[in-house]
Amino acid sequence: MHPFSRLFRNIQSLGEEEVQELLGPPEDALPLLAGEDLNHRVADALNLHLPTADLQWVHKTNAITGLYSNQAAQFNPHWIQPEFPELHLHNELIKKLQQYFGPLTINEKRKLQLNFPARFFPKATKYFPLIKGIKNNYPNFALEHFFATANYLWTLWEAGILYLRKNQTTLTFKGKPYSWEHRQLVQHNGQQHKSHLQSRQNSSVVACSGHLLHNHLPSEPVSVSTRNLSNNIFGKSQNSTRTGLCSHKQIQTDRLEHLARISCRSKTTIGQQGSSPKISSNFRNQTWAYNSSWNSGHTTWFSSASNSNKSRSREKAYSSNSTSKRYSPPLNYEKSDFSSPGVRGRIKRLDNNGTPTQCLWRSFYDTKPCGSYCIHHIVSSIDDWGPCTVTGDVTIKSPRTPRRITGGVFLVDKNPNNSSESRLVVDFSQFSRGHTRVHWPKFAVPNLQTLANLLSTDLQWLSLDVSAAFYHIPISPAAVPHLLVGSPGLERFNTCLSYSTHNRNDSQLQTMHNLCTRHVYSSLLLLFKTYGRKLHLLAHPFIMGFRKLPMGVGLSPFLLAQFTSALASMVRRNFPHCVVFAYMDDLVLGARTSEHLTAIYTHICSVFLDLGIHLNVNKTKWWGNHLHFMGYVITSSGVLPQDKHVKKLSRYLRSVPVNQPLDYKICERLTDILNYVAPFTLCGYAALMPLYHAIASRTAFVFSSLYKSWLLSLYEELWPVVRQRGVVCSVFADATPTGWGIATTCQLLSGTFAFPLPIATAELIAACLARCWTGARLLGTDNSVVLSGKLTSFPWLLACVANWILRGTSFCYVPSALNPADLPSRGLLPVLRPLPRLRFRPPTSRISLWAASPPVSPRRPVRVAWSSPVQNCEPWIPP
């Protein structure tokens, strides 16, 4: 049935004779459909012209939103965070693959070397402050989203997917180190690496004296008077520390020895002796610097000891009064219980600059509750909140990593059909725009015709899903400074609190109570039920870098496609009688019998598990002869969209209002849905050309009742996209602005147009006539526009009818000099000659879905327990 038969009869401006002529023979109707006057008259009847600007646009139609009506993201307080297995590829992946699959090809090695490890070194990187680490996409659930996102990041760190930044040059992580990480190894399983330990022993005494003195100190306590220490090292007078008989080097060495003995001595002794508030703050800074660094496994004596020269140069600039105003812990801190550090008291820790900072969470211990909703009630309910930070199994050296981030993070639903689980979104969009833009490598994506050519066969199908596929591919540690994420800590919710203020006294604690509101208090109580003591760890700021491939970088899809395609190629070579197809994290297996498919699946699962590749068993599906893949149903008869997409499209299209101007954003979102099913309709994409014109013009579009009903009738009747076959071309078509010609193996045909036409339009009409009169599914032509198959550049009515006529037709290029239809198109009928032998090969869009393999040797041992379905030594190759 003609696609315009019902539409033309409903247009009153078209007479009955004109309708019969338009629906008549194609040689008469097609030139008329290309006429500009007819297209304008039909557009007027369907009200397809752009509306005037004085009409008010509609910005929302049921489920489709347009301009100024963006839907707010929905936060789920009961999101389930996924659990990640130990994702660690084998250290010798290429050698291990060669043991299983034999020698690898050059392309397979190249693809694997790109991913092991992956490298990402942009020319420019923009760094953002840590306060932008977690995006506030849910203002009504800011605190809940903050802790949920921080917990997600710590979950990734525990799975070995993220590095934790300890300082500018040190990273720590959990899991097994890769071979390239062994070169930068500092600490592994609590033990110093040999190379790092040797370099530390060869360094200066200042850099490592604290660690060495601690190892060589006697076990019995040594009584050292605090008074003597303060008089001998620092002194109550500034001049006494500067004008001694001993040299500066001796003073520095004595200072280090005394401080090391104090840190190794019983803390109860120091607590009993106490300390005066008038003691120089420099002594307390160095003591706390050593204790904090010793707990974290590092020494920071060098930074504190090297400042003696700076303090000596500032002796004349600062008086004794100004010196006493330097940073010193408050009185409550000095009177805290030293016998149980890390449990109560305003515990100090070092930031990355070596400056002691206080734990915001534990600081509520020493403050009086400001009201009934004070956080003091929550903090004081537990004595031991655990450590402020953690250290992984492995510590490595890294390039200079600033205390900044390169992208924010937030949580969303895992997918539109699963709102119970959360997914982490990393915003590394700076590498896709601006001066920091990176031009990502391109890779081929299978189109609809490619899927039909390669997968539309009568096989048994099985689809596999790689669990957390992006997180399988490791990244070089040198790329960490470009892929930084983090959390600003609770200070994000109290902007008045500043850790860099010079007036550090108890008045600062009053600003902390700005957090004490009813909403924060009730939210923390609910979060405590979820996270327990981990709430304290999540409240601290931290910076992490990606150790595995993140999903927010444009390089990730390219690398993942290379990785999975290399695996599919190796499996295909070893199982030449099956079909293996990989796209991103989806792997498809096809075999002639279900028993053979089961054997291949068992072997692949065991091999992948040994290589460290985890498959999601819950998403493994056996499809039989109907493969569901990428939203399509692929069978031996062709490809059709899944029912859920058809129902969604019909629901959205029926909800579109009639005779109301819809803004172009609604048209964009509607065409996104219609384009998915358009290749299966009679008129294809050409039916949506009026919508494309409105979107390109950035103006509104009005659906008439005739146009809407016509679209509904088109999308109710779907036709499969069938597989193309490799045959020899036997029909050729050519045209001139005034005539057309067709050449077959047995005859030559020619004709003329009633009026001159553009050459591309004439070539398209000639191809349509050749298809109608010969029924050939393969045509030879010399016009590149017709070869492309993109008909949206032609007049609207002609494009729709041509798409209907040429549906399922393939084209092959023939030069004009060799085209046998060239002379008939010019009105000449020469003697019939043999046609050029042109063989058509179905295109695969540069997708290597299968690898050519040698024939199966008859002496090769069988891979399955029963007889192989291969009846001969020839490998089965997709058509």
UniProtKB/Swiss-Prot annotation:
Residues 1-184 are annotated as: Terminal protein domain (TP). Residues 185-382 are annotated as: Spacer. Residues 393-634 form the Reverse transcriptase domain. InterPro entries: DNA/RNA_pol_sf, DNApol_viral_C, DNApol_viral_N, HBV_DPOL, Hepadnavirus_pol/RT, Rev_trsase/Diguanyl_cyclase, RT_dom. One of its GO terms (biological process) is symbiont-mediated suppression of host innate immune response. Gene3D superfamilies: 3.30.70.270. It catalyses: DNA(n) + a 2'-deoxyribonucleoside 5'-triphosphate = DNA(n+1) + diphosphate; Endonucleolytic cleavage to 5'-phosphomonoester. Its EC number is 2.7.7.7, 2.7.7.49, 3.1.26.4. Keywords: DNA replication, DNA-binding, DNA-directed DNA polymerase, Endonuclease, Host-virus interaction, Hydrolase, Inhibition of host innate immune response by virus, Inhibition of host RLR pathway by virus, Magnesium, Metal-binding, Multifunctional enzyme, Nuclease, Nucleotidyltransferase, RNA-directed DNA polymerase, Transferase, Viral immunoevasion. Mg(2+) binds at D465, D585, D586. The record marks Y68 as: Priming of reverse-transcription by covalently linking the first nucleotide of the (-)DNA. The keyword ATP-binding does not apply. Residues 304-345 are annotated as: Disordered. Activated by host HSP70 and HSP40 in vitro to be able to bind the epsilon loop of the pgRNA. Because deletion of the RNase H region renders the protein partly chaperone-independent, the chaperones may be needed indirectly to relieve occlusion of the RNA-binding site by this domain. Inhibited by several reverse-transcriptase inhibitors: Lamivudine, Adefovir and Entecavir. Residues 383-724 are annotated as: Polymerase/reverse transcriptase domain (RT). One of its GO terms (molecular function) is metal ion binding. Terminal protein domain (TP) is hepadnavirus-specific. Spacer domain is highly variable and separates the TP and RT domains. Polymerase/reverse-transcriptase domain (RT) and ribonuclease H domain (RH) are similar to retrovirus reverse transcriptase/RNase H. Hepadnaviral virions contain probably just one P protein molecule per particle. PANTHER family: REVERSE TRANSCRIPTASE DOMAIN-CONTAINING PROTEIN (PTHR33050), RIBONUCLEASE H (PTHR33050:SF7). Multifunctional enzyme that converts the viral RNA genome into dsDNA in viral cytoplasmic capsids. This enzyme displays a DNA polymerase activity that can copy either DNA or RNA templates, and a ribonuclease H (RNase H) activity that cleaves the RNA strand of RNA-DNA heteroduplexes in a partially processive 3'- to 5'-endonucleasic mode. Neo-synthesized pregenomic RNA (pgRNA) are encapsidated together with the P protein, and reverse-transcribed inside the nucleocapsid. Belongs to the hepadnaviridae P protein family. This is Protein P.
